[in-house]
Amino acid sequence: MLTLAALALVACGGSGGESTATTAAGATTTSTTVADTTPATEPSSTSSSAATSSTTTIPAEPVMPLTGLPITDPAAAQRVALVVKIDNHPDARPQSGLNQADIVFEENVEQLTRFAAVFQTNAPDPVGPIRSGRTQDVELLGSLNKPIFAWSGGNPGVTKAINSSDFVVANVQTNARQQSQSYRSRDRAAPHNLYAQGSGLFTMAPEGATPPPLQFNYRKEGQASTGDSSGGVDLKMDGVNVSWKFDAGSGKYRRFQSGKAHNDAALGQVDASNVVVLVVDYVPSPVDTKSPEAQTTGTGEAYVFSDGKVVHGTWTRNDRLNPFTLTADDGTPMLLTPGRTWVELARTDSTTPLGA
């Protein structure tokens, strides 16, 4: 089994109150050379599912750490990760920027879901609607190596948690307002109308900031996919039924919400090369008992939907600074297709793989 340890670009040289954050971040950008590898870590299990580890496999060629695709833009490859909290309320759809994100995490919040969209390859202009963060974001996003965290604030408890984290805090209504060029769209009602420019948010990276590590293991070029044939997956998320359906023509999964195509405002139906389902426990947030908090360290059930197939296994993660380790039931690594990935943080018994 491979450990998804920190690998920095090999060979590259609280409920949603919109109160303000108080921490300012650095505002200059610089390109830095990063180390080839870091030692693999040994994941530990917090339940009956145990896991072992070996050293991380180094890709045969330099790849983008959030997609596994070959590097075509060296400047983008040196950027830090940018996380934008994006609204999924019905009045916020269609959103802007989802089909430009390298990775999107879908989290349950308060009878809704919210997206943590992660960018490095692309700078989405515009991106949004941007909403508040949650305490679960601190644990979930720690493996991205001190990302820029773009949000609209949160209740006092959430704001304290985010400001105390290792994120570069970018509240688009306060300390990041100028750099992000944030604005309220006139064609939607608040609070579902707050947008920013991703290119501006990237300028908030502090001097010396480095790219994120590789987050998943990917199939090599020409390597056959494994697993059982599957047409996709149905998920019962909080407040919305989600379906991902495989399109053999494009090799991508297309997203549906409550029976309707889920669209990006500029780029058509939301799609992804991979859909990773992590079955997690949700507990009440320590700062707001009405807000669910996904537990993303420990271990749990996992599914990888890729190339029209599904592989079932286990996720493990012993620390928030480490990426998830995905291991199939037969003990082999769960491999993704290079490309964009959506990660669904699903509750127990909410996942139904579809037949071929």
Regions found by a protein language model. Name each.
Residues 8-11:
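C-terminal motif of bacterial Sec signal peptides marking the signal peptidase cleavage site
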Residues 13-16:
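Bacterial signal peptide processing site
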Residues 19-59:
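Extracellular mucin-like PTS domains
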Residues 53, 58-101, 105, 110-356:
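A surface/extracellular/periplasmic glyco- and lipid-processing/surface-interacting theme
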